[in-house]
């Protein structure tokens, strides 16, 4: 049904006699939600026509694709793009420009991590959704998809020389890998 979308794999999840199939696609440069919906519907209709015993009904999405909402599944498997940003801040730069040290930043990061754990937060990053929203709006994307992209995991490491390594990972968001579950 599309020249841009390619089926990567189909995952199966069972609950009693019910089955959820999660069709995973690559979609080129498109976010691809409409593309994968049409392709998946076509595949499901074909399966139903095959007369598979027990297959009486299918529904597209059924909340397993977790469109426009965060989910642990999308954190682990990625829906859309997975983005990783890394930087090593030199000790001299932190001292001269930021008026702090890698040790002070690392200590604060530990407090922030513990606060995230204590509160039951889903991630340990501060407000990734603000920047993502601005990018989505500027690029004409559906701002409601920010809920999938607002989860961010950060990691900091104090280096032996006083430099500070920092990474931020946004595990899911609109982009060239999309999925639809049924």
Which residues does each PLM region occupy?
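Conserved alpha/beta core surface patches that mediate binding of polyanionic ligands
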Residues: 1-15
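Short, conserved phosphate-binding/catalytic loop or strand-edge motifs used
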Residues: 13-23
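Glycine-rich anion/phosphate-binding loop at the beta-strand->alpha-helix junction
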Residues: 25-181
């Amino acid at each position: 049904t599309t020249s841009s979308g390619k089926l990567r794999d189909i995952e199966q999840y069972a609950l009693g006699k019910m089955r959820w199939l999660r069709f995973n696609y690559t979609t080129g440069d498109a976010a691809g939600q409409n593309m994968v919906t049409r392709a998946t519907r076509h595949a499901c209709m074909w399966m139903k026509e095959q007369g598979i015993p027990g297959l009486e009904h299918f529904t597209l999405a059924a909340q397993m694709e977790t469109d426009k909402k965060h989910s642990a599944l999308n954190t682990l498997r990625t829906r859309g793009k997975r983005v990783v940003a890394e930087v090593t801040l030199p000790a001299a730069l932190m001292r001269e420009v930021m008026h702090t040290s890698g040790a002070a930043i690392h200590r604060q990061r530990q407090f922030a991590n513990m606060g995230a754990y204590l509160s039951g937060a889903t991630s340990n990053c501060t407000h990734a959704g603000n920047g993502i929203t601005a990018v989505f709006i500027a690029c004409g994307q559906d701002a409601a998809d920010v809920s999938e992209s607002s989860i961010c995991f950060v990691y900091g490491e104090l280096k032996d020389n006083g430099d500070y390594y920092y990474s931020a990972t946004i595990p899911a968001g609109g982009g060239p890998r999309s999925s639809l579950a049924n």
